[in-house]
Amino acid sequence: MGGLFWRSALRGLRCGPRAPGPSLLVRHGSGGPSWTRERTLVAVKPDGVQRRLVGDVIQRFERRGFTLVGMKMLQAPESVLAEHYQDLRRKPFYPALIRYMSSGPVVAMVWEGYNVVRASRAMIGHTDSAEAAPGTIRGDFSVHISRNVIHASDSVEGAQREIQLWFQSSELVSWADGGQHSSIHPA
């Protein structure tokens, strides 16, 4: 029980004002551990948007204690998709991937939090829905490897590149109070 309490407490850990940029390293106390507050790109793909899964995805990230700092729905331009998937250009499925990703709207989001890159990868599950564990987004909602509902950055460096590709800095919010402000409760 104690371990569960501390894991929950760490998930909701809020740091002071953010420095510019998608990643921030914060040290708590002298000689204490390092806590990395990061940003990552998460995109609900056209099949997820069409199946109205955006709310379920947002709910999972919010329950995990992450802070939404940017979100938009768009018909992804082929130029953005080509740059986003540049590492897959030589793969035989690349043309079909670009057609699929441009077949309908995508909901792109930037989430911020403690180790959010690694945590989001665990939350979305294996790329192949047949191998994705139940309880993961793909394990619960994906029906085929080519229609796997969601994308999440696979590294801090990849997240930085992808966020800059999909968002302008003016489209991202910096929570001055660490995301703890509530409009329902007076300050």
From Swiss-Prot:
Active site residues according to the UniProt entry: 151 (pros-phosphohistidine intermediate)
Topology relative to the membrane: Peripheral membrane protein
GO terms, molecular function: ATP binding; cardiolipin binding; GTPase binding; metal ion binding; nucleoside diphosphate kinase activity; protein-containing complex binding
Catalytic activity line of the entry: a 2'-deoxyribonucleoside 5'-diphosphate + ATP = a 2'-deoxyribonucleoside 5'-triphosphate + ADP; a ribonucleoside 5'-diphosphate + ATP = a ribonucleoside 5'-triphosphate + ADP; a cardiolipin(in) = a cardiolipin(out)
Residues of the transit peptide: 1-28
Activity-regulation annotation: Binding to anionic phospholipids, predominantly to cardiolipin inhibits its phosphotransfer activity.
Keywords annotated in UniProt: ATP-binding, Kinase, Lipid-binding, Magnesium, Membrane, Metal-binding, Mitochondrion, Nucleotide metabolism, Nucleotide-binding, Transferase, Transit peptide
Pfam families the record matches: NDK
Domain of life where this protein originates: Eukaryota
Coiled coil: none
Tissue distribution of the protein: Widely distributed. Found at very high levels in prostate, heart, liver, small intestine, and skeletal muscle tissues, and in low amounts in the brain and in blood leukocytes.
Gene Ontology CC: mitochondrial inner membrane; mitochondrial intermembrane space; mitochondrial matrix; mitochondrion
Enzyme Commission number, as recorded: 2.7.4.6
Co-factor(s): Mg(2+)
Annotated family: Belongs to the NDK family.
Cross-referenced NCBIfam families: PRK00668.1
Protein task: Major role in the synthesis of nucleoside triphosphates other than ATP. The ATP gamma phosphate is transferred to the NDP beta phosphate via a ping-pong mechanism, using a phosphorylated active-site intermediate. Through the catalyzed exchange of gamma-phosphate between di- and triphosphonucleosides participates in regulation of intracellular nucleotide homeostasis. Binds to anionic phospholipids, predominantly to cardiolipin; the binding inhibits its phosphotransfer activity.
Name the record gives this protein: Nucleoside diphosphate kinase, mitochondrial
